[in-house]
């Protein structure tokens, strides 16, 4: 049986919200090491929405290097003037399976 962690976050040089680990970076290599130690075969990356669009690219990079280990439910600014093109072309990005939004932000 394959074991998949359905929600992990990757970030780089960022301050995360209190619910997350309070470390400046949690990288693809950190995730792979912990996954191997826990017997997890693959993971779905959910880029933290509070960190903006650039964090999606961190996830895409992980998928490019380990397509057998990672896939992504990404996010974007719903107020973006380019939102229709973003949605239209979303799945062309490596590993993007769909979207995940949280609606608990003050905006």
Feature-to-residue mapping (PLM):
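An N-terminally biased module of ancient metal coordination in phosphate/nucleic-acid-related enzymes
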Residues: 1-54, 88
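Active-site gating/metal-coordination segments in enzymes
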Residues: 53-107
